[in-house]
Amino acid sequence: MASLITTHRVKASIFASCLAIGLLLTLFVSSASSWRQAITPAGLRLEQATQAIVVSEPLHCPKNKTQPTVNPGGSHLAYVTWLSGTVDQTDDLENDKYFVATRILLWHLLHNPSTRTQGIDVVVMVDPSVSEARRARLVRDGAILHAVEFLTSSVALHPEQERWKNIMTKLRVFQMTQYSRILMLDGDTMLLHPLDGVFDDPGAQIQHTQDHEPTTLAALPPTYLLAGISEPADSHHSFPVTKAEIKDPGYLNAGFFMLAPSEAAFEHYRSYLQVPGTFRSTYMEQDLLNQAHRWDGPMPWKELDYKWNVRYPTENDFEKGLVSMHEKWWEQKYIYDNQKVKDWLQSRRWEMKGWYDAYDRMNCDA
């Protein structure tokens, strides 16, 4: 594959630098020939799927933003993902799988022409455990960085995995009241198509809290928004996933959900961390949100269209119009068969790297 960077309206010096980027990309794509020839589940060859790394338009250094973007209708919308310290806290960022996954998500949302947003802010919420090197890399990648303090609990919590010990901090997204609505995404999310349309989903609208009995917890907010999807048991499912295929009906997966920030909602959630026995904590913030927004309670969560996201994606999902998936690029325990999907997931890691290698050549800090 060759990459040719042309423009008729830029100065010769800019043309020269873009040409250098193109040469770098040519070398990268040549080295990727071992996976480039595979057929993707969407019926495209990977050389077509990797078109984002063939720079057909000028790359621009990111500008640090201090104010939220005003979206159509005067609203302030955002994509937010949360990053905490992983097991590996060295500055070998290329081998930190969860950090790499976050960078892939940013690349999908900000830079890939086939998946990027049209003007919605992309924010990474970081807690104190995230190193300065990681923070600097995320800003260079184009993310808005939002630093928060840990959210602690006065009751004992029993997460299934040790690496989830700080994950209650993720609930601080509800304090980001500079935005009217937020799509919260786990870092191991990948996109096939743009996600902007999810903000128009019927389920993604603010609701009124229903009448309810007095509670020992903090007061419920008068309005709220929590909308998302449940997950299938594995990759043996239809597209879209049917109710009969859902592993735990009525149980929201907190890796992909829409919310309306609210200090009142945040204080209500935080009160669960101060009263023993109010929720199970195996899946931490996911269990807390499901208890607060249970379907038989005063703030039931709403379902989004299942085309927007799925766990354990399949070739059929790709072909039928799946928009995004919640799946690790390096490990897919519950995707059975569907080797093309697994190949596609792994290829995103290297496509992202090729794009950013060219991006870094621009010397944005100079």
Residue map of PLM features:
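Glycosyltransferase catalytic domains, chiefly GT-A lineage
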Residues: 2-366
